[in-house]
Amino acid sequence: MIQLDKFLANIKNYGKNNYIFFEDKRYDYVEILQISYSLARFLESYGYRKVYSNLKNSPLLVSLYIASWIADIDLFVPINPRLVDNELAAIVDGDSLFITDKISNLEVNKLYIENATCFFESLEYTQDYITHAKALTAHVSSGTTGFYQKYLHKIDQIIKYANDRIADLGLKQDDHLLVALSINHAFAFSYQILPALAIGLDITIIREFDAKLVARIINQNSVTALALLPIMYHFLLEQNINKNHNLRYLSVAGDVASISLVTAVKDKLGLPLLNGIGMTEVFGYGQNISANTVNKVKIFSDTEVKILKFENSNYGKIFIKNNMLPLNIETEWLETGDIGSFDHQSYELSFYGRYKDIIIKGGSNISPFELETAILKIPNIDNCIVTSKKDKIWGETVWAYLVASQQYSLEFINNQLRNYKAEYKKLDGIIYIDEIPITTTGKTNRKKIKEMINHE
């Protein structure tokens, strides 16, 4: 409770000089904190021990997070606002309060909030400033494994994480942060809202990502810092952005940013994309604060890394250990599902992709990301994705889907790859397409590509 009390005291001390901007309104930190206490008492009045919410971004959602730490409840679960009732049914427990701004037929106890701003401003100020600091926060996995897993963290873990990130992310005291990704997303929560509150930054929040709106805010306001998923940067680059913008900091996480995207961002915005890396289970655990190679990330000093190397290889499965390991995971080392190598001197992790995407050809492990990085060095190839095709002899063969303004032969591409990669990693086939498919979360849809190549 001491950590939380200090955190809340800091928010109060930032007082009326720092703001959260939303649509045409602004709220100072004192208002945000006061509403958080009022909201905590409001939640307690319902009598439920568990609270779920899939609200879109607003100052109300920021206060709801803080209120969950203050209130006498046991569990707070923020949920992706894009999920539909069928998916929500697998997440939301019956004996709980579900706070939503969408019409839902879910058979649970619902608090429907039609207008977050009106609700926020209508809450009466409480004089009860008791802080209980007992609820666990559970961020939810994306469901790609077939079920939704809740990862539990104590308030002390979260507050310590926020304080530890103050100097790690490259944010500065006078930054103005634009939050365009759902705050219920672990990336936006851990890399944006938490450190911004800990530092005392001005924050502009938009309800949900809209490339035109983001561009307009960048052009009109004093926003200096932005963090998005790779696909969001693609959409943002299609907009008109003034060359005299005030941006100085661009972070990217959620998926590996391609060389072509990094180059395009640098050309248009004049800034490097700074890679971050993390998981829903442990939040972010690494972030570059200066330009680096595309697939390298500086790991936070409070995170230990272990690599279980593949045979005859300098890279392998990535395991991590830090203070953010979820309470409901009984393991000392967390397997990330990623593959890479780690430099203990520079404390940098080289990331080569997901383990499930590794191609095993004739017993040799081949990283798609490693090949994609090399392929994108060939002129006129704008984007690519490398995948495996089932083969009776080799087990798997190596194929690439290419988006290119000039079509090359397989032989030509393999000749180019010899400058970068060993012979056994050469491509067995290429297919030209108009665009690389993406998932609903904006990531490269490797599953669909694998199904396409294998006619599944």
Identify the residue ranges that each predicted region occupies.
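AMP-binding/adenylate-forming catalytic core of the ANL superfamily
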Residues: 41, 339-425
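Gly/Ser/Thr-rich phosphate-binding loop
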Residues: 225-227, 237-294
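AMP-binding/adenylate-forming catalytic domain of the ANL superfamily
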Residues: 421-444
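Conserved AMP-binding/adenylate-forming
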Residues: 25, 39-82, 180-182, 365
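AMP-binding/adenylate-forming core of the ANL superfamily
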Residues: 306, 311-329, 333, 339-341, ...
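Conserved AMP-binding/adenylate-forming core of the ANL superfamily
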Residues: 8, 13-45, 58, 86, ...
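Conserved AMP-binding A3 loop
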Residues: 28-29, 133-163
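Conserved AMP-binding/adenylation subdomain of ANL enzymes
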Residues: 159-176, 184-225
